[in-house]
Amino acid sequence: MKLFTISILSLALGYNGIAQNSGKSNSINTLKNEVEKNIQTNYDGYKKIALNIWDYAEVGFKETKSSLLLQNTLKENGFKVDAGVAGMPTAFVATYGSGSPVVAILAEFDALPGLSQETSFVKTPIANRNSGHGCGHNLFGTGSVAAGIAIKKLIEEGKVKGTVKVFGTPAEEGGDGKVYMVREGLFNDVDVALHWHPDQHNTVTYTSSLAIKTAKFRFYGISAHASAAPDKGRSALDAVEAMDY
């Protein structure tokens, strides 16, 4: 779980670097130590949240328990939470602070179908369960919430200024929950958005990636007798296979 902690620190310190006034603020090292202390103090609680979301293993747009757990954690730590935003029951925006900069931290928490798994290094599907966390989104959502809470404490103590928002973004795995949130204008006042993802190493990625466009294609064939009149028919399957190339 060490990299998990480092990733939370990276998110929180990213905010601090944005929010600081270089001439009048605390040193970044002092803030880093305070953030790390806050995270370590609450580490066992965050670990429990991450394991609970792992066990819930809820697929996109159905992450009811996972979303509620993160929302309640933020509420308990002084955030104002708007739930069910952009027409999605499991989406939320949690806000603390006022004024600029407005920094968003994105939290994902959806699982994937067909990836049921015990917390083991070998493939061990859970009996009678289909979905599971193949991309570590149980850590993703928890880490983002932990970073938001650490930042909130610094704002509360007057050590940094601005507003921190934790965006609960459902259905990253193919459902495009963030798209609907953007369409509803929920990011209009945001100066910068911070995002992370569990991985086997800790790094900053500067690369971009391709977008996803969901579409449906229908292929129509012409029926014919396969033996008596094969030349009269057209196979829809041939067109499907041709599209693979």
Describe each region flagged by the PLM.
Residues K123-G132, N138-L139, I155-Y245:
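Histidine/acidic-residue-rich, glycine-tolerant segments that coordinate divalent metal ions
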Residues M1-K24:
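Bacterial Sec-dependent N-terminal signal peptides
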Residues Q20-H133, T142-G162:
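Acidic/His- and Gly-rich active-site-bordering loop/insert found
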